[in-house]
Every structure is written in structure tokens, then in C-alpha cells.
Amino acid sequence: MSCMAAENAQTAPGPVALTASLPDPGQKILYVHEVMPVTPGPLTLYYPKWIPGDHSPDGPIGDMMGLEFSANGQRLTWQRDELDRFTFHLTVPEGARQLDIRFEFPSRDRVTTNLLDLTWDHVALYRAGSPTKDQMFQPSLVIPADWHYGSALQTDTRDGKRITFKPVPFNTLVDSPVIAGKHFRQLDLTPKGSSVHRYLDMIGDSAAAIAISDQQSADFHRLIEQAQALFHSHHYDSYHLLLTLSDHTAKGGLEHHQSSDDKARGGSKMFADPAHFMLDASLLPHEYTHSWNGKFMRPKGLWRSDFEQPEKPKLLWVYEGLTVYLGDTLTARSGLWSPETWRDALAYRAAVMAHRTGRAWRPLVDTTIAVDYGAPEAWANWRRQNDFYREGELLWLAVDMKIRS
């Protein structure tokens, strides 16, 4: 057993009580308080580094502010690891049975005056030395009393501003984002006769932003039906498509086992503007497909027992490429895209890859090993981008054609 594992092997009983508070949405700062059961002695804690679906060690540790540890009413000295800025060392004093952890997290691109898109890995520390599936957390969220929320987490209680969720392992918590807002709408997408509920939860900066049409709603209903017809299975108790419709938050999506965290590129105009809807229509099918390909089943090397160990992303052409292919197929089969739009999207990606000069020197597998979502656009054709999405889709189209021939 390593020294770090040895000093943390004394995992204390009881769940960690984690509270994230947003007292002033206009301030865009989350106030974090953890109460962690401990025993005296050396303790090492991690801030989540390798977040599943990000494919790189990009946990926003640089945004953490005001970190403070205390026990028995006394503030404790702590030290960051010299070789890993995501790791913190401290000593729990004799007689202490719980550790209080406090810090602030400025959530610039996930909070507006009307909404919050919360991912728990931004607001938690966890113990080194034991798998995250063995570390229980009971999360609470404090938001304005008139806000509503959606999540795959099960609610224990709500008392005014405070929502307390039922305890879950830390890996499940990180896999279960929450959206909340003044303007909230939930659609039940559950197919007739099914006991497994699927929901589309929406938040926006205005009531108009979440005004989905009857036709769009029907298409999302068909998405669930078509996914069931494609996969012939489900592996979740329920599923929540969490959709943020704001012009003031980050864009894109992140997959989770029982939910997806989707932020429309069209923002508040996604449902109102047909052009924006066409651009965003494949986002939710893509992340929903990941519940099968990437969560329920994932390539070797992309599963780790905690969020500190590096992933081995060599098979991202399977994880992402196959998901693009199947997700876009579901987008068309559900009616979110027309068949012509699907063909146009595929033709565009094929044209881009056919003229990708960087393929002469850089193989596809290297783009999976050196993932860089923040790479500049300059010289992208020669340098290559994260082509395991586009070229991966074309590869799986070829595989599908081979199987069918």
C-alpha cells in the first residue's frame, strides 16, 4: 500500500455533508462548506482533476478561492502538493472527529441572475486513498426560494431555499449535475407503457427561452422512442436531459449516466429560431447516446477508480466517433433533423476530413492522446483538431456499411 493510501485508509464512517450555496446569483459565486468525518492523523485530499467526458486534466482548480480547513473550532495549516496542485495535505489534530472545509468558487459561465448550472466536481474535495465509489456524500444546494430545479439526484427534503438530496457515492455525485432557475419547465418524455421515466428539464433567462413548440416536443418524445428501438435496453432508473437556454453561459454538452448537461449554442433562441434549432438539434441525442456508449459501456483506459489517475484516451474514436454517428442517426430518425440535413452534415464532415492536410503527418489515434479543446484555430488544418469526432464518425459509417454489405 502506498504511503498516501496508508494515511487515508482510515476512512471515517458516515457521509460527507456537502453544501453549495448561491446566496446572490448576481455575484456568481458559490460558497462551499464540507463537513467530513475524520480521525486524527495525516490526511490527503484531492480536488477532481480528470472529469469523465472532458478527456483531459482540466478540473478548474485555479478558480478555487478562500480555502480554509478547521477542526474543533481551530483553523488548520494546510499545504498544497509541490508536484500536483490538485492535492492538499494537512494533519487532523487529536480529538477531532470532523473536518470543516470552506472555499468559494466563482462560476462565471454557469450562473446568471436567473439560473444555475451546477456540476459538483467544481465544489468538492474528496479523500485520497480509496475509490470514489466508496466515499459517500450527502449534497445540499441553497438557491433562491422561488427557483425550481432538475437533476438525476433524488431529493430528500426541500425547506425554502435549501434542497437536500439523498446520499450517493462521490463518483455518482460528480456524474449528477443540477440545473436550477427562476424560469424552469419539465417535459415528461416517457414512452407509453414504460415505467422508466425520461424528462427534458429546461432553464432559461426568460420564459420565452423555454417556450418549446408542440412539434419540437413531439420530436424529443420520438428521440426516446428511437433510442429504445436502436439499443433495445436501458440501464438507468430514470433519465434527465438537462438543457440550459441562456445567452450568458458556456455552450456545449457533457454526458452522464442518468442525465446530460446540455447548454445550447443558440442560447435563448434555440427553440424560437429554426436555424439555431438545426445547429443545436443533435446536441441532446449525442449526449443521450453517451449513456450507452461511454457510461454504461466505455473503452478500456477511460475508467478510473478516482478523478486523480490519468485516463488513457486512445479509444476516443470509439467513445466519441461512434457516439457522433449514432447520435446523428437518432437526430434524423426522431425528426429533429430532416434526412437532407443529416446528409448535408455528413457530407460537410467528409469534405473537411478529405482536405485535412494534417492527416499526412498525424494519425487519428494521436488526436485522441493529445486532446486539446482549447487549441487555437490558426493552422488547424495542418495541426489537426479533435478529429476523433469527425473522422471517427466516418470510420463508423464505413464499419456500418461493411456490416450491412
Which stretches of residues belong to each language-model region?
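Hydrophobic h-region of N-terminal signal peptides that target proteins for export
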Residues: M1-A6
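C-terminal, non-catalytic "cap/extension" segments appended to globular domains
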Residues: L394, K402-S405
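Acidic/His/Gly-enriched intrinsically disordered linker/tail segments
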Residues: M297-D306, P310-E393
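Long amphipathic alpha-helical segments
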Residues: L223, D237-L241, H355-W361, W396
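Early extracytoplasmic/domain-onset interaction patches
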Residues: A9-I51, D121
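Juxtacatalytic substrate-recognition/specificity segment
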Residues: D188-L316
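Non-catalytic architectural context of zinc metalloproteases
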Residues: V35, P57-G66, S70-Y236, T249-G252
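Surface-exposed patches in mature extracellular/periplasmic domains of secreted proteins
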Residues: H234-L241, S334-R343, S405
